Regions:
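Residue-level preference for the first positions of well-ordered beta-strands
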Residues: 66, 305-307, 335-337
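Conserved pre-motif I regulatory segment
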Residues: 30, 271-309
């Protein structure tokens, strides 16, 4: 059985002698590491998955598959010869390139869009086969929005206009484009997406998808960060192995390591809310009119916006904490954050909340985190 061309590319490389194990990690495997984290995070019963799926009017299983497929392509730009030549590896073969890698002008996230553009204009990808009944312009707009959150996994959107893509072609090389095409085909076989359930021709739907992409973008950054932990996702080179490398064989391993990585973060450890009684019981004083309102206002499972405003000293913070406690206890939220204008006000609020949040959450599953960021 012949080795796929995309296994001749590295995605992570050893940076110091302190790093134990192999000198590099195959690009295809790193992509699956990150996709595995996303797959496990966006579980179909996860509140975020359910909320975004509801916004897009699609099944949670489809959202999960779409996110996993897209994350698996997040480092498509690393197929560029200029990137590969940052660390030439003899056993992976030469990667001729016209220019050297330039992290300012042509970082690998930008190169991802450049490769995607070349795959389309050179006919490696035929999106009309995925969307036979949709306008090509709508298809293009959808994929630009889709890869906005994937290629921008370093936290900043990247340019994806045709002019920029053409200018970046010199950093890529023909072999990298061919390998990327083969990789996309095999990834799609692993994570097939029912494109027909996506209403990409509906501008209202596309607007909602772009709104949802903000959530997915933040999640993509998190997944890439966690999936790059070489203490958990050990580097694999496949050198000396009898069997050729395989995405399908590696995938169960990647999912298992993703579970290990997620467990170490404690981010998804379920929290249990203590029952809310009253302002008097929580804070030890009789409620102001605003606080009384916060105790009694109707709360619902659907999204609600509460605006609490009153004179200085009316106890707005306590009212907000009481209302938040009620929402969490009812199962309508599982956490909260405060946004404040300055570091000084944030520091002060952190101290106040630190004294109280233990009355909102139970410690039965371990301590609940409170972070000043």
């Amino acid at each position: 059985m012949e080795t796929k061309s995309y296994f001749n590319y590295w995605g992570k490389a050893k940076k110091s002698a302190e790093h134990k194990g192999a000198d590099y990690h195959l690009l295809a495997y790193h992509c699956l590491d990150v996709a595995a984290v996303g797959h496990q995070v966006l579980d179909e019963n996860n509140a975020l998955c359910l909320d975004v799926a509801e916004l897009l009017a699609i099944p949670p299983s489809l959202l999960r598959q779409l996110f996993t497929f897209t994350l698996a392509l997040h480092d498509l730009g690393k197929f560029a010869a200029s990137f590969q030549n940052l660390k030439p590896i003899p056993e992976l073969g030469d990667k001729p390139c016209l220019v050297n890698y330039d992290a300012n002008l042509a970082r690998h996230d930008k190169l991802g869009f450049a490769i995607w553009h070349q795959l389309l204009i050179q006919g490696y990808l035929k999106l009309d086969q995925w969307f036979p009944n949709d306008d090509p312009i709508d298809v293009k707009d959808f994929f630009l929005a889709l890869f906005d959150f994937s290629f921008a996994h370093h936290g900043k959107p990247v340019a994806h206009d045709k002019r920029t893509a053409k200018q970046l072609k010199k950093y890529v090389g023909d072999a990298g484009i061919e390998a990327a095409a083969e990789f996309i085909q095999d990834v799609y076989q692993m994570f097939p997406v029912n494109w027909q359930q996506l209403a990409i021709g509906d501008q209202n739907w596309l607007t909602r998808f772009k709104q949802a992409s903000w959530y997915l973008s933040g999640l993509a950054v998190f997944c890439d960060w966690l999936g790059s932990d070489n203490q958990i996702f050990k580097y694999h080179t496949e050198i000396g192995k009898i069997e050729p490398p395989s995405l399908k064989r590696y995938w169960p391993h990647a999912k298992g390591q993703a579970n290990v990585a997620l467990a170490r973060t404690d981010l998804f450890t379920p929290t249990t809310a203590l029952p809310f009684d009253s302002i008097k019981q929580q804070f030890g004083f009789s409620p102001s009119p605003l606080q009384k309102w916060a105790e009694q206002v109707e709360i619902k499972s659907v999204g609600q916006l509460f605006i609490l405003e009153d004179i200085t000293g009316a106890g707005k913070t306590e009212a907000a904490l009481a209302l938040t406690h009620r929402l969490i206890a009812a199962g309508y939220a599982d956490g909260f954050y405060f946004g404040l204008p300055t570091m000084a006000t944030s520091n002060a609020m952190f101290g106040r909340v630190a004294e109280h949040y233990g009355k909102i959450f139970s410690n039965e599953n371990g301590p609940v985190s409170l972070v000043l960021a």
